[in-house]
Amino acid sequence: MKSSFGKKEGEYSRLVSKSSNKLLNSLWEKKQIPEEGWTEHTLDLFLSWLSSHDTNNRVDMIPVGAGEREGRVLTPLVQRLHSNLTHGIGRSGNLLEIQPKALGSSMLACLSNEFAKHALHLLGLQTVKSCIVVPLCTGMSLSLCMTSWRRRRPKAKYVIWLRIDQKSSLKSIYHAGFEAIIVEPTRDHDALVTDVETVNRIVEQRGEELLCVMTTTSCFAPRSPDNIEAISAICAAHDVPHLVNNAYGLQSEETIRKIAAAHECGRVDAVVQSLDKNFQVPVGGALIAGFKQSHIQSIAQAYPGRASSVPSRDLVLTFLYQGQSAFLEPFQKQKQMFLKMRRKLTSFAENVGECVYDVPENEISLAMTLSTIPPTKQTLFGSVLFSRGITGARVVQSSQSKTTIEGCEFVNFGSHTAEQHGGYLNIACSIGMADHELEELFTRLTSSYAKFIRQLAKEDDRRGGSSGRRVPMNESFDMEND
């Protein structure tokens, strides 16, 4: 049977192949996030195109692997999950170096770094000169930065760490082989802010003993983002590196502005941010950005070994799927949702006799007092919220107890300060939160709180007395089905 595929169809086939190749080659030449997002079919085509460049996937030759690592994968499912990109990125000792037998994987790594830089430029950090995507969590990425600076500062023993009650950033210092000099925040009305004077005094006293100052831009309220502009000026004046822990700070326009201003007025050596918290990809990667290419190159050279390409792959696919046209939408939506969340939480707090902490520079996290719940019952309330499917919210109870992390003792760990308080509830509006989630959050919070307070009142009555606790009777509370 003769084929009916004629000259016209053949021309069309060649045109399709040519347009596909043109699209892929254009992407590689420009190395920028495309204007419009790609379809899933095109993303599959892109991955196949990349993997065809690795020697173990070549179709024009039969490779004979004679080394200890040849991209061999035993399980077909695992191979498909990795889209045949099995070599990883970098070479032993440098994440930026090209792997000759893994050209496609190396191209993927290059695109992820260039896309990351482009993304930061779109967000407002236009003076960033270089970026690297690493298959490490935020804490390990901070540790990698500090490790890379060891030779530059051979007398260094310490890192100034502005207290943020989140374990991984503190552990990153000790993992890199240094000790933390802990600076407690100071109180500015409701907010906990940077003690700039103490940092300046320590920098003046310690000098060459300091590896760097680590600041934090994203945190749970009432902790405020650090004053990185003032710290960068101190670091520049005394020639001390400045490491910024910007875990999920890319979601905040104010944080972006502060990072850019800190670079302009002082010194910022590296800025580390989480991929999953900012770009909605699976956990496992971080983005290290620098305002000098040499800063990022030295960090890349400190990585001991070859690295997984999975975080780079996920980030590239996400940016290609969005395109520039849709890239900023989640960030703009987060800003709107945060303002809406703050209004709702303020209204709820007023209804139940509580108040929301005023931390104007924190554009992601909120804190509400829990004065109507006895301190001994506050963590139970947090458990009730979790059992109702409210994840991520946390209750912080004031405590005199000490918590030891890496040999450092903290009073009232979780509160970012040793100061005592009446307990509070933290909730956050992170990127990707939808309107229906916010509405459901407050529906569940409202009903859970009302039932919890009524139950406490019943317990008081059974004990033969009343604590005088206010039982909210607002119409919006579901008073049925205790």
Swiss-Prot record:
Reactions catalysed: O-phospho-L-seryl-tRNA(Sec) + selenophosphate + H2O = L-selenocysteinyl-tRNA(Sec) + 2 phosphate
Signal peptide: none
Cofactor requirement: pyridoxal 5'-phosphate
GO terms assigned for molecular function: identical protein binding; O-phosphoseryl-tRNA(Sec) selenium transferase activity; tRNA binding
Region (Disordered): 461-482
Site positions (May act as a substrate filter by repelling compounds with a negatively charged alpha-carboxylate): E68
Primary role: Converts O-phosphoseryl-tRNA(Sec) to selenocysteinyl-tRNA(Sec) required for selenoprotein biosynthesis.
Domain of life where this protein originates: Eukaryota
Binding site for pyridoxal 5'-phosphate: R69
Pfam families the record matches: SepSecS
GO cellular component: cytoplasm
Residues that, per the record, bind tRNA: R388
Localisation per UniProt entry: Cytoplasm
Keyword terms, alphabetized: Cytoplasm, Protein biosynthesis, Pyridoxal phosphate, RNA-binding, Selenium, Transferase, tRNA-binding
TM annotation in the entry: none
Record-linked SUPFAM superfamilies: PLP-dependent transferases
Subunit structure and binding partners: Homotetramer formed by a catalytic dimer and a non-catalytic dimer serving as a binding platform that orients tRNASec for catalysis. Each tetramer binds the CCA ends of two tRNAs which point to the active sites of the catalytic dimer.
Native source species: Caenorhabditis briggsae
Similarity remark: Belongs to the SepSecS family.
Chief location of this protein within or outside the cell: cytoplasm
Region: Phosphate loop (P-loop), residue numbers: 90-100
Protein residues bound to substrate: R91, S92, Q99, R306
Listed pathway(s): Aminoacyl-tRNA biosynthesis; selenocysteinyl-tRNA(Sec) biosynthesis; selenocysteinyl-tRNA(Sec) from L-seryl-tRNA(Sec) (archaeal/eukaryal route): step 2/2
Name of the gene: secs-1
Name of this chain's protein: O-phosphoseryl-tRNA(Sec) selenium transferase
E.C. no: 2.9.1.2
N6-(pyridoxal phosphate)lysine: residues carrying this PTM: K277
Region spans: Tetramerization: 1-36
